[in-house]
UniProtKB/Swiss-Prot annotation:
Protein name from the UniProt record: Small ribosomal subunit protein eS6
GO CC terms of this entry: ribonucleoprotein complex; ribosome
Source organism (scientific name): Pyrobaculum arsenaticum (strain DSM 13514 / JCM 11321 / PZ6)
Lineage: Archaea, Thermoproteota, Thermoprotei, Thermoproteales, Thermoproteaceae
Keywords: Ribonucleoprotein, Ribosomal protein
Pfam families recorded: Ribosomal_S6e
Length: 148
């Protein structure tokens, strides 16, 4: 019985929300890979998404804290020689380090799933994750300035 923390980011508002996903909904995420898109309707109990919105898996981390890496196939743990993100940020240019990473497939040993909302192309409504009144005012001013 997997339990996941789903961190859902909203590209319109720039905000993120965290949800606790348990069975049977968690079983729908098992087997998905980084980059896969699923219908946003499955999260109707947690957040109201606009019609036609999808959720794109962008990453995650395992129970030991190792990040999921798109280049490692399957739900495995591997040591890689990392030169940069994801999983390692070198202090100097050219530095490399052996790091433990997870594969690109979600399994029972994944604890956190990172995802982003993919809006329909013709969507122009408010963001799914609400923002404050001041931030909304700034956002509308930027859009008006860009339109001019």
């Amino acid at each position: 019985m997997p339990t996941f923390k789903l961190v859902l980011s909203d590209p319109i508002s720039g905000k993120a929300m965290q949800f606790e996903i348990k069975d049977p909904l968690a079983q729908r995420f098992v087997g998905l890979k980084i980059g896969d898109e699923i219908d946003g309707v499955i999260l109707k109990d947690f957040i109201s998404l606009p019609k036609g919105a999808k959720i794109k898996i962008t990453g995650g981390s395992g129970i030991e804290g190792a990040p999921m890496v798109p280049g490692v196939p399957g739900p495995v743990k591997r040591y890689i020689l990392a030169e940069g993100p994801p999983g390692y940020r070198p202090k100097k240019r050219g530095m490399r380090r052996k790091k433990l990473v997870r594969g690109d497939t979600i399994s029972d040993s994944i604890v956190q799933i990172n995802a982003v909302i993919v809006y329909p192309k013709d969507y122009s409504g408010p963001p799914a994750i609400p923002i404050g009144a001041k931030e909304l005012e700034k956002l509308t001013k930027k859009e008006e300035a860009a339109a001019q």
